[in-house]
């Protein structure tokens, strides 16, 4: 049976780029763990801002963080007070000078990570999983996605046995490297256990300029 490779990892260097961009000789593992720590901290702290993606760049003892969020106003705060406090906390956490750049996600309805988190939140609020999936699918297509597939896996509806249910509309080519596929994953922590939500959104093909 064919297994599903990670859609973004599969397209790295073709139509996708890395989310951490830096070079290290001896302290590679140390910096990698620092990256993971930073991502986890930012995801937790800025959860209500709807963080879609975090990109990290490093040069010498400086770190530049690009945060893509659906609600950037929450991160920035009044007159930039929140972002300044965040900058200080991150500098304390890493012992490095940190620069933060906040970017707005214009269409959160077709951002796979935000769609996955939205479905997971609905499942935690005990919304029927089929309704949550169908609503997100119709919204994504309405906002210009060419195809979307949502998979929910776990004890759906509190069933005794865990199972996987998926819903797809439009085209979602898994093997076409030039296909711009966005991938998102989230977990819904329900009283019955964890339900995993995977979202694949096809936004069209990236054609080379030559």
Swiss-Prot record:
Stretch forming the signal peptide: none
SMART domains linked: KH (SM00322)
GO biological process: translation
Keywords in alphabetical order: Ribonucleoprotein, Ribosomal protein, RNA-binding, rRNA-binding
A cellular component annotation (GO) from this entry: cytosolic small ribosomal subunit
Membrane-crossing segments per the record: none
SUPFAM superfamilies: Prokaryotic type KH domain (KH-domain type II), Ribosomal protein S3 C-terminal domain
Domain of life per record: Bacteria
Domain KH type-2, chain residue ranges per copy: 38-106
Pfam families: KH_2, Ribosomal_S3_C
Molecular function GO terms recorded: mRNA binding; rRNA binding; structural constituent of ribosome
Subunit organization: Part of the 30S ribosomal subunit. Forms a tight complex with proteins S10 and S14.
Described function: Binds the lower part of the 30S subunit head. Binds mRNA in the 70S ribosome, positioning it for translation.
Sequence similarity: Belongs to the universal ribosomal protein uS3 family.
Official protein name in the record: Small ribosomal subunit protein uS3
UniProt lineage: Bacteria, Pseudomonadati, Thermodesulfobacteriota, Desulfuromonadia, Desulfuromonadales
């Amino acid at each position: 049976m064919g297994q599903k490779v990670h859609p973004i990892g599969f397209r790295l260097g073709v139509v996708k780029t890395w989310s951490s961009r830096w070079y290290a000789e001896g302290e590679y593992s140390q910096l990698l763990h620092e990256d993971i720590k930073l991502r986890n901290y930012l995801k937790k702290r800025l959860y209500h801002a709807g963080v879609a993606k975090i990109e990290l760049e490093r040069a010498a003892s400086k770190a530049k963080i690009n945060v893509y969020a659906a609600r950037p106003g929450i991160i920035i705060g009044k007159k930039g007070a929140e972002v300044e406090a965040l900058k200080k906390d991150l500098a304390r956490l890493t012992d490095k000078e940190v620069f933060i750049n906040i970017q707005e996600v214009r269409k959160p309805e077709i951002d796979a990570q935000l769609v996955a988190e939205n479905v997971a939140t609905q499942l935690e609020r005990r919304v029927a999983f089929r309704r949550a999936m169908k609503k997100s699918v119709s919204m994504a297509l309405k906002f210009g996605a060419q195809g979307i597939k949502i998979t929910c896996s776990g004890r759906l509806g509190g069933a005794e046995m865990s199972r996987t249910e998926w819903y797809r509309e439009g085209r979602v080519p898994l093997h076409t490297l030039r296909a711009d596929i966005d991938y998102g994953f989230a977990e819904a922590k329900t009283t019955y256990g964890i339900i995993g939500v995977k979202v694949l959104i096809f936004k069209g093909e990236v054609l080379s300029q030559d």
